[in-house]
Amino acid sequence: MTTIATGHTAEELPRPEVGAAYDTDVHFYVADGIDSVLPYMPLHWRRTFEMRGTTIGGDTHVPPRFDFPTGSRLRLDAFTPSGGLPGTDAAFAKDDLLERYDIAGAVLSSLEAGQQGQGFSGTEASTVMCSAFNDYAIEHWYEVDNRFRIAACVPSVAPDAAAEEIRRVAPHPGVAAVYLPLTNVPLGSRHYDPIYEAAQEQGLPIFLHITAAEFNYQGTPAYPTGWLENFSERRVAYTLLGPVALASLIFSGTLARFPRLNFVFAEFGYAWAVPLMWRMDSTWRYARPGTPWLTMPPSHYVRERIKFGTQPVDDPEVPGHMDQLVEMLGAETLMFSTDYPHWDGDTPGRVFTTAPQGSKDLIFRNNAASIFRF
């Protein structure tokens, strides 16, 4: 993990030894809150949100106990030249991210849209919000620089409407994935089948990412042992969501039912995947009659169909342990990500520096190119 608090020149920041890299986890924000996305909504909904006084953005849904240690989730050196919030100006992000680090393509998602996809404003409103965010992102990011590709957000709470949204936006060349916010419905539930069917039909991977609303209100995933007390607990707890979600996808038969569909786990961590695969494989062998739809060990499905975003890269005390972890997990499962413009982001030249060149090629470039539309 590289925590960045002050600005640097491009010359001061090392670049990867693999040429141009792909960044699989970048976030955009809307500069003027809901006013930014209202023009992309039907008139009825514009008036509805205006009458309600609906607001989006910020961390108003997060209790003060979870305040960020820097006072903001955003990098202090990534504010725009006009003083705007980081992640609100595509032209500035082009220079600050794409050019600065030699990024060949970046996958964008909106945590603000993700919260709406979880039903933050209600089921019908969530559908309208997600669609508006997607159109906003295409116009204000992809059309500024086509290296910015969109993980189109869909309402997890309304799977049929989500499937319609996928089919609506998928033909656009700026759309690279389907961003599916987590809810308290397990990912392996047939509730999501319309979404998975549409994504597979359109050749788009399912992009999974936290929204920061988890653990905070009914409808989002809950922490298994009760309420969390502080930011540190909360940040670590996100790594617990990934294993449960992955096990659900595997043992429910979802990957077997949708054989051409890939899933991306962004910012859930990945070190846990190694012992989880061991546990899933042994469970499959001992309890195989209960999951007859699995014709191969779970680890096979993981390595063939699952990708993990690398941010945040945790720093083991013994540097060689990271290389061992990558070897056990398989470099073919990892995709580099910066988490720009967040405070704890990683940069290309400072992570996986001792990995073999073949692994770097996979992590920084080839894996992303194989499943995203760049």
Task: Give, region by region, the residue ranges found by the protein language model.
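Aromatic-lined glycan-binding groove of carbohydrate-active enzymes
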Residues: 206, 210-214, 250-305
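Hydrophobic faces of well-ordered beta-strands that scaffold small-molecule active sites
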Residues: 21-24, 106-108, 150-152, 176-180, ...
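Aromatic-anchored helix/helix-loop segment that forms the rim or "lid"
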Residues: 236-245, 289-320
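Glycine-enriched alpha-helix->loop->beta-strand junction motifs that scaffold or abut catalytic
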Residues: 172-177, 200-205, 258-261, 302-307, ...
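Mid-to-C-terminal alpha-helical segments outside catalytic/metal-binding sites
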Residues: 2-21, 31-105, 135-143, 164-168, ...
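Active-site gating/metal-coordination segments in enzymes
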Residues: 100-245
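Catalytic metal-binding/acid-base residues of hydrolase active sites
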Residues: 27, 184, 211-212, 250, ...
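Short aromatic-enriched loop/helix-cap "lid" or pocket-rim segments at secondary-structure transitions
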Residues: 32-36, 120-121, 218-221, 275-279, ...
